[in-house]
């Protein structure tokens, strides 16, 4: 099962735009989950993920396979159509 990880900060302007676009995109693929994880949850899990996936800026979307291997990455804002392309694997 493919997942999309979204790394963001609640005070990041571009992150808020991306969040709205994600909601508007209504990606309807059952094999793609949107996983949200604020970059500072205080539990250590987020720190591991930020380091593991080498997150250097937000917002960052990473599509991973079931083993956690990165398939695709995008840093910055995507519009609704671009998000659908990213989810379908046509946006590199």
Predicted regions and their residues:
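Thioredoxin-like thiol-disulfide oxidoreductase module
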Residues: 32-57, 67, 85-90
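Local sequence-structure signature of Cys/Sec-based thiol-disulfide redox active-site neighborhoods
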Residues: 1-28
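Short, flexible active-site loop motifs that bind/organize anionic cofactors or intermediates
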Residues: 8, 40, 73
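Residue-level detector of flexible, active-site-proximal loop/helix-junction positions
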Residues: 11, 34-38, 78
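Non-catalytic, surface beta->alpha helical segment in thiol-disulfide oxidoreductase systems
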Residues: 62-92
């Amino acid at each position: 099962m493919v997942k999309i990880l979204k790394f963001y900060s609640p005070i990041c302007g571009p992150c808020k735009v991306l969040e709205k676009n994600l909601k508007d995109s209504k990606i309807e693929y059952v094999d793609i989950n949107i996983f949200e994880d604020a970059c500072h949850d205080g539990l250590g899990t987020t720190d591991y993920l930020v380091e593991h996936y080498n997150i250097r800026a937000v917002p960052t979307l990473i599509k991973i396979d079931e083993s956690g291997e990165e398939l695709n990455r995008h840093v910055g804002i995507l519009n609704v159509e671009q998000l659908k392309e990213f989810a379908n694997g046509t946006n590199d």
